[in-house]
Swiss-Prot record:
Upper taxonomic lineage: Eukaryota, Metazoa, Chordata, Craniata, Vertebrata
Location of region: Disordered: 62-145
Official protein name in the record: Putative uncharacterized protein encoded by LINC00304
Ranges of biased composition (kind: Pro residues): 84-95
Top-level taxon in the UniProt lineage: Eukaryota
Amino acid sequence: MQYLHCCLQIAPNQEGMVQAGGQGHGLARVVLRAVLSPPCWAPHSPCGSPAATEAGRLMRRLPSVGGRMTAPKTPRFLTRRPPASSPEDPPLPHPKTPRFLTQRPPASLPRRPRFLTLGPVSSHSSGDLRLWTAHQLPQQGGCPG
């Protein structure tokens, strides 16, 4: 995709909202990347180029509703909600989740500190770095170790 680099003067409307617009076909026909620095009145600004003039014409040609520019429409398939499952169905794990991540140990087992031993962090490190789970910090009264 080719980007048209130019400076655009984005004027806020009366409520202070920046007006943005697009065509309601789900696909953007023209992608404009607004470069706000340097500003458009800078002497080395490319705003006088034919491409920038054409971009300004395209921005003015977009339809407006009630004085505001219309936003691009969301494709229909993105707005549909999946049917709600019945309450008696157990929640299924995500199909891509590995099985060992969905199994929880029984509550009767005593809690042991869970941490990952990553080994020496650098040549200056004499010990191991331990990553503690967040729920253990309040129980230990601060950072353990």
